[in-house]
Amino acid sequence: MGSLGGLALCLLRLLLLGLQRPPLPGAGAQSAAGGCSFDEHYSNCGYSVALGTNGFTWEQINTWEKPMLDPAVPTGSFMMVNSSGRASGQKAHLLLPTLKENDTHCIDFHYYFSSRDRSSPGALNVYVKVNGGPQGNPVWNVSGVVTEGWVKAELAISTFWPHFYQVIFESVSLKGHPGYIAVDEVRVLAHPCRKAPHFLRLQNVEVNVGQNATFQCIAGGKWSQHDKLWLQQWNGRDTALMVTRVVNHRRFSATVSVADTSQRSISKYRCVIRSDGGSGVSNYAELIVKEPPTPIAPPELLAVGATYLWIKPNANSIIGDGPIILKEVEYRTTTGTWAETHIVDSPNYKLWHLDPDVEYEIRVLLTRPGEGGTGPPGPPLTTRTKCADPVHGPQNVEIVDIRARQLTLQWEPFGYAVTRCHSYNLTVQYQYVFNQQQYEAEEVIQTSSHYTLRGLRPFMTIRLRLLLSNPEGRMESEELVVQTEEDVPGAVPLESIQGGPFEEKIYIQWKPPNETNGVITLYEINYKAVGSLDPSADLSSQRGKVFKLRNETHHLFVGLYPGTTYSFTIKASTAKGFGPPVTTRIATKISAPSMPEYDADTPLNETDTTITVMLKPAQSRGAPVSVYQLVVKEERLQKSRRAADIIECFSVPVSYRNASNLDSLHYFAAELKPSNLPVTQPFTVGDNKTYNGYWNPPLSPLKSYSIYFQALSKANGETKINCVRLATKGAPMGSAQVTPGTPLCLLTTASTQNSNTVEPEKQVDNTVKMAGVIAGLLMFIIILLGVMLTIKRRKLAKKQKETQSGAQREMGPVASTDKPTAKLGTNRNDEGFSSSSQDVNGFTDGSRGELSQPTLTIQTHPYRTCDPVEMSYPRDQFQPAIRVADLLQHITQMKRGQGYGFKEEYEALPEGQTASWDTAKEDENRNKNRYGNIISYDHSRVRLLVLDGDPHSDYINANYIDGYHRPRHYIATQGPMQETVKDFWRMIWQENSASIVMVTNLVEVGRVKCVRYWPDDTEVYGDIKVTLIETEPLAEYVIRTFTVQKKGYHEIRELRLFHFTSWPDHGVPCYATGLLGFVRQVKFLNPPEAGPIVVHCSAGAGRTGCFIAIDTMLDMAENEGVVDIFNCVRELRAQRVNLVQTEEQYVFVHDAILEACLCGNTAIPVCEFRSLYYNISRLDPQTNSSQIKDEFQTLNIVTPRVRPEDCSIGLLPRNHDKNRSMDVLPLDRCLPFLISVDGESSNYINAALMDSHKQPAAFVVTQHPLPNTVADFWRLVFDYNCSSVVMLNEMDTAQLCMQYWPEKTSGCYGPIQVEFVSADIDEDIIHRIFRICNMARPQDGYRIVQHLQYIGWPAYRDTPPSKRSLLKVVRRLEKWQEQYDGREGRTVVHCLNGGGRSGTFCAICSVCEMIQQQNIIDVFHIVKTLRNNKSNMVETLEQYKFVYEVALEYLSSF
């Protein structure tokens, strides 16, 4: 037993030793304050316990002193709770003393869970309470386990002084699970925990209400996926940490957000981590939640404008937390949903860019630091902006319906964005001129986008604009100039109809209707005979109809019946039809009876005292024969005789007895009534009988007689006589000059005068008679020889005249005015009427601007002859004016210079200084003159307003020049120098000039001719601000439009600079065509109310004078039908020195005026083209001509004749094989010389540079390449930067027209490589694209060229059958230029010979450009310009007509 008892005791001890906790490392070391090993009473360590429910509490156990019998209790000294018999959830607390630590430390402890049934006795929680605050939730816990011994745990608490904390152990019982929970060996170590992570300091977080607060927990230690992290609130609420990020192997971080913070969210938070080795706890950080501020009062309104509001924010009194770091103004329309905010950085704030007449709601926003720091908007200020001026006037105003008496306008609808006010008015203002009086009217428009003006006059040019106005201002639309449609015209004024009757003609003239209601196109005159004085007259055929063109308000009716009253009904027509007719009656004069023919035989019978003749009845003409008379005339040989063609009939009846008393050579032998001579019957002269009071005495056998028979008609106070010599008796001398039976001249007026009494002749003897006979024969021979010589000379002169005038044509006035004109020729009618060659019932052939038949007009004197005469004008005397009709002949004769020509006439002009120029010579003004000898005369100089402090600032080298009936119409000045640019603009403003004409380039032949005095954008010259608005480049001139404003003035003026760029450096232009178009453009665009036109070249003399002289003479030719160039230049030079400076310029002025008169103004506005096209293309059935045909004939006349010296290069032998025809050679001055080198090949190609309407040298016109010129062709394309090639002919090997481009590959043509890129076919067009480069100069790169082959033009036709397809070529060309070469590349155009087809295409392109740029169509001018450089451009009338037709088609496509 003893041995067994001892053995049992030993086993018990061993068991107790197993339950005892193992010794801790360093367990014997001294623990810091707060630690406790429980070897002594726990109170000695500062620990305390709190009594739990029903006495459930911690107990200190020391099994060494008091062994425990329950084997589940460990051995040693420790704190323990017994959960046996306890209800679930009972808690017992062990409180450690309060700790204040300054550095990193660690609390570790051991815990023990045991039970008899191996079930968990409950839970152990550890709390860390900071600064005496709430206990919160546990930071560490263990439950549901039974330990196999003591287990160590660590607490890494990061709460430091001055804060303090307390650790609380809490045990929680679990019902039905008896057992023990023990804690022992609590230590506070002065080093980091080995396993539990330590937190770095957690920072306070400040947020604004509603924002998410984010805490970042940073811990030192290793992170494990099994670790648990959370954010613990002061009151115990836990929030899981959302994001964990490993910083490095010894540090990691985690973040957690507190969402949607509010004032209730204000608290303290700390980070807690639970790992396998224990827990880490951070310090508490505060979550501070601020209330964003908001103002108490609304903003204060200080000022109101149309687009702004001045406010005072009133942000001093707020609700919420400061500080305020930002003030903002929030505004919105009261009806809108959008809002904008502006930052306010001053006590007052101006809201900009507001909409006018809009109600706004304005609030103030205040912002404090932090996200979400902007408070709610403060109370609103509600106010409305003022109205503003409209943004612009009505736009895209157009006329959508034009009628004779009304117009319908349409414009782009606009709303508030344009009116800038909700209350506005829209008004249409219009004005027109009627009967030389200007009318203005306006109407208020109620509709939104269209309106019809009613009650207008037909064909009235109306200037109208729309006016948009509101309470603050008004804006106008662009002015529209529109013409109402034509209507039928009113009646021709009856009182204006005047008639000039003749025997078989009636000249009638009238005035246009007072209300033309359009362009009078035709007058219709219906005429018919309504009665005759001659009962036998057959009037059935005396009727007809005549049409007259608008500029012919007169007509000569021929082929009428004498003595007949005609009814004339005249009515005028416009394109709309004929107006009401008006009728008048005019009677022709009676005509002398028509005498029958008599044979030159001897009389029926003759005795010594009688002679028997045969009398035949006369045929009445307009009035019955009143009486027949037999007249016997004695032929006295000693008296001189008049020529037969001026012998008159015998109007004064003289009886035989009175003849003796009056010494009359004739007497009336008989007077017979018509009833006495119903048929032919014989009559014996000298039968000694009396007939109706006249004695027929016997004839004297010693005298010679002529027997005359005359018939007389009387009616309405007119007496007309016709007579015939029937026979002679006694063979009177000189009778051979007149054959018996020949009718004599007619007496055109009634005569009742008495002859003066003459003393009777005495008889002479036969010797004297014989002498008279001999003298008469001699005289007859002399006269006959003189007549023959005269006739021969006239025939020679006529032949020479016809040769000389072969190229002449009739010249009418420059514009369509009814001025008297006449054909050039030697035949002139000495009567008061010049008769037209037209048919009675036909149209007079005419064209716009000129008459191809002379206009009929009443004259009291004959036209002066135009036969060539020797002109000899003395020097220094005025020369006579030249009629427009005579100008061609005059210039031709003056150029011949036979005795007196242009050289002598020019030298007769005053040269050099002719007046004082003292002001210009002053020292202060010398540097203002470009040339010392071209300066301003004192009497005509422009005086500028004197600037303050500079008495010489009134001088500028400029003179006033008078125009045609317009004083000071021009200012001639020098090209501005750098020193005078400001003075130049002062002059422009002072004189209110709207046009500057510049006839020089800035630099010519390397010398500065004029400085650039205009800006590219905006420039200020002194106190004048000049702004460039638009630049319109054309082939021969450029039009720049500026606005000009002077400082201190509100007025803004528009100014145009017309810059003629084509005047050559030397001499004068080859042709005046371009300059004439330039002059017309200046005249058209210069406002009538503007000040003088400022004209300058370099010196302001030569070219300046040419422009002014041409413009002035064109006005004179238009208004007077004459030109007076000599005296015009003479007057110009009296106002400025040496205007028109050289003889060459003087001749050029003549040539320009001649071309203007020959060609006229053929431009047609686009708006009138459709209506006028019918008239100008209509074929007159009488003349088989049209105005287009007349234009083309004129074009052929004025086309320059090519001389061999003009195309000398093409005529060189080495170039012969490069020309298809030696008849079609390019002019030397138009040649594009090849630049690329190709071996020994010359630089010549049969091509010519041609201008388009708006680009100089835009076209290169050439022939289809020959086999030996293909390389030259591609050199041309490359050298002249040609981006397009247009081919207008078919390929034909018979004519050596082969393909000259590669197909689907590349090829080399001389130095040029041509590479095929693509091709497509579009109806009649094959479109190819090539890439070309010069292989000899690869550094120049390659170029893209399009090739347009037009296959819709058959070889046998002058024109293509389709206008639309050719227009498609033009449009493709335009599109390519816009997209690929920026309109800088040229276009090669070729047909077979580079003539008709090429010219037609170039003309069509230019017409399209003209329509786009200037809204006019002038086919004549375009073709004339092309022919100036190549005479075979547009070769046939059909091609010329085709250009017109394509223009019409082009307009129809819009």
UniProtKB/Swiss-Prot annotation:
Active site: 1097 (phosphocysteine intermediate), 1391 (phosphocysteine intermediate)
Tissue distribution of the protein: Expression is restricted to the CNS. Distributed throughout the brain and spinal cord.
EC primary class: hydrolase
Function noted in UniProt: May be involved in both signal transduction and cellular adhesion in the CNS. May have specific signaling roles in the tyrosine phosphorylation/dephosphorylation pathway in the anterior compartment of the adult cerebellar cortex.
UniProt feature, compositional bias: Polar residues: 824-841
Pfam families to which the protein is assigned, alphabetical: fn3 (PF00041), Fn3_PTPRU (PF23144), MAM (PF00629), Y_phosphatase (PF00102)
Transmembrane segments: 771-791
Record-given protein name: Receptor-type tyrosine-protein phosphatase T
Residues spanning the signal sequence: 1-29
Domain MAM, chain residue ranges per copy: 34-195
Residue numbers binding substrate: 1065, 1097-1103, 1141
Residue spans, topological domain Extracellular: 30-770
Domain Fibronectin type-III: 295-388, 393-487, 488-594, 670-767
InterPro entries from the UniProt entry: ConA-like_dom_sf, FN3_dom, FN3_sf, Ig-like_dom, Ig-like_dom_sf, Ig-like_fold, MAM_dom, Prot-tyrosine_phosphatase-like
Modified residues (Phosphoserine): 1221
Entry EC no(s): 3.1.3.48
Localization per Swiss-Prot or TrEMBL: Membrane
Keywords: Disulfide bond, Glycoprotein, Hydrolase, Immunoglobulin domain, Membrane, Phosphoprotein, Protein phosphatase, Receptor, Repeat, Signal, Transmembrane, Transmembrane helix
Similarity annotation: Belongs to the protein-tyrosine phosphatase family. Receptor class 2B subfamily.
UniProt topological domain (Cytoplasmic) ranges: 792-1454
